Amino acid sequence: MADPGVCCFITKILCAHGGRMTLEELLGEIRLPEAQLYELLETAGPDRFVLLETGGQAGITRSVVATTRARVCRRKYCQRPCDSLHLCKLNLLGRCHYAQSQRNLCKYSHDVLSEQNFQILKNHELSGLNQEELACLLVQSDPFFLPEICKSYKGEGRKQTCGQPQPCERLHICEHFTRGNCSYLNCLRSHNLMDRKVLTIMREHGLSPDVVQNIQDICNNKHARRNPPGTRAAHPHRRGGAHRDRSKSRDRFLHNSLEFLSPVVSPLGSGPPSPDVTSCKDSLEDVSVDVTQKFKYLGTHDRAQLSPVSSKAAGVQGPSQMRASQEFSEDGNLDDIFSRNRSDSSSSRASAAKVAQRNEAVAMKMGMEVKGKKEAPDIDRVPFLNSYIDGVTMEKASVSGIPGKKFTANDLENLLLLNDTWKNVAKPQDLQTTGRITDSGQDKAFLQNKYGGNPVWASASTHNAPNGSSQIMDETPNVSKSSTSGFAIKPAIAGGKEAVYSGVQSPRSQVLAVPGEATTPVQSNRLPQSPLSSSSHRAAASGSPGKNSTHTSVSPAIESSRMTSDPDEYLLRYILNPLFRMDNHGPKEICQDHLYKGCQQSHCDRSHFHLPYRWQMFVYTTWRDFQDMESIEQAYCDPHVELILIENHQINFQKMTCDSYPIRRLSTPSYEEKPLSAVFATKWIWYWKNEFNEYIQYGNESPGHTSSDINSAYLESFFQSCPRGVLPFQAGSQKYELSFQGMIQTNIASKTQRHVVRRPVFVSSNDVEQKRRGPE
């Protein structure tokens, strides 16, 4: 039996680092020999620590995810003996509307460490955790913290996935999977928590992709333990057997992802389910066995098993071709913007005129004024220049970057042809893959699928992970001033963006089968013939990639040789890699020195841009600049404007999204944070919303309301020092509390709550030039 005190200490360390660490990082915090620590984690079991092994070019990387069997009681009033924690989950996450002084009004307990809760934590050997660490552990272990799951969700591959009005705002995932009691390896309901739509709902409920990934890996582990490899074959009388054509779930599009389970789980490891092993036998013989040798176990008796599938096993003939091509357009709400080739391989050999037509159709029609529609009060229509801008160049090299490579219309032509072929070639039918970042047709057209789903040429930026577990990556390169435009393409290429959502932590991986055959000449000389191993990296939600990340880098010489040997192939492999992170890894601030007189640092870690703000959208695997940033910024600076319409696409400043795709705003540091170097610092104004839906600046008077004893400068200063705090203040005889985390102002006496927003002061490009010249 593992020592309870040591296990509690290890859990405490893991939760202090986001709930997940590599074994090497954990060894740096605990003075134990590696063999002893690994044995302790194995002895504690997968109900305490989920052990994952990630294969990459540098070898095997082992990581540990903290979990627990402790649960929060779901009853509002529990009168019977209960072994669950009794607390307010929103308060645990810092999001309860009731402030600490009004906690008696909440129907759930705010006393996290009450005598009863402490005894329960002690029974689960968690008594040493503080509130923040306990919150981290429970969020990724207890399904009670997930958003509501749709009760009428019927599964994928049906004409109607659920009976709710569309779009459904609930999670379309298997509820039994989240609880660890799903008995179906080929479950009709999705096991993919990393699906784009699922992630969008998760973010709206405060769960970052990093946390969701941890939940995915824990659920994968439970599912694999409940359904060991010996029970893969589905019973023919249950759900109609495992017919290969019965399911069209998007999260089964690519199946060749690995799960490296704890040796306690399975001595043979676990691969993805294969409904029809015999049908793939011939194809598997074509796959090189050398790849499997890279996933050697360390200190165990196990070997991780690869299940690669060549293009012959992908089901590329007949109706399945057309079905694979058409499945991506299930949601097709962007069909009016992008033209997609739905024909077979012969039609993909388009003439130059057809290719030019298609490239022209790819460009988004921006800036066309919409007429005949009544303007909503909170919507501002911003004129954008037409289409995209060509020739975006990366300034900085990174593991997932392409230094000095420009996207051109010709590149996109090849990319589109490759996409069409891949849709027809690489779709294994009815293969259950959990934790996959999926895509749909319109995503592929608009953002080259925001969360991917295309083949992964496992380069330095791809990941290998358990049972389909995959990770979103984000490398934030600087973009040259000449390419400050746009969604970043001319009539052919979409640029990229990431959300203000913070993100991911820790290694996870994915190795996908690469088709050995192509259906068009264009693909045949560009597709790699065998999957490469991959590395992983992870950054904390706080944006500090070092401490909480394990980054297996590739030397510049190797990366350069790959690019120079076949730059087009390298470009396509880079673009088609769907594993990117939606966190704040990379530059988070704009360099004021660059704005003023030029930055003298040779390796500046801040973004060099000609404006003190920078609006970007995540496309492919990089952040790309919007075209008319001043118009977006001017609208954002007005607290009354919540939406900007770009033709039929809207930017939502509350959710920081363009349609459902994330956006972000980089800026210079706050004026209150760095007042001594404040020439180009961002000045923030704080507003509260009155009963007439008018935003009133703090410190200003409004009809029927006395001005408060605080102003924007005071609020900003307090916010910079304590961004999750609660600030008490007074306006006349009324006393209030302002919650920075919830951006809510609460009247202590009447309990009335008001919405609070924080917006910058608008600075135009002319203002920047004037400040740069100085006073005349």
Swiss-Prot record:
Residues recorded with modification N-acetylalanine: A2
Modified residues annotated as Phosphoserine in this record: S257, S262, S266, S270, S274, S283, S325, S351, S398, S544, S667
Modified residues (Phosphotyrosine): Y501
The WWE domain, residue ranges: 671-758
Annotated segments matching region Disordered: 221-249, 308-355, 457-483, 512-562
Annotated stretches, region: N-terminal domain: 2-254
SUPFAM superfamilies assigned to the protein according to its UniProt record, in alphabetical order: WWE domain
Induction remark: By type I interferon (IFN) and viruses.
Residue window of motif Nuclear export signal: 284-291
GO biological process, one term: regulation of defense response to virus by host
Biased composition (Low complexity): 344-353, 523-546
Function, as annotated: Antiviral protein which inhibits the replication of viruses by recruiting the cellular RNA degradation machineries to degrade the viral mRNAs. Binds to a ZAP-responsive element (ZRE) present in the target viral mRNA, recruits cellular poly(A)-specific ribonuclease PARN to remove the poly(A) tail, and the 3'-5' exoribonuclease complex exosome to degrade the RNA body from the 3'-end. It also recruits the decapping complex DCP1-DCP2 through RNA helicase p72 (DDX17) to remove the cap structure of the viral mRNA to initiate its degradation from the 5'-end.
Record-stated family: Belongs to the ARTD/PARP family.
The protein's name in its UniProt record: Zinc finger CCCH-type antiviral protein 1
Species this chain originates from: Rattus norvegicus
Gene: Zc3hav1
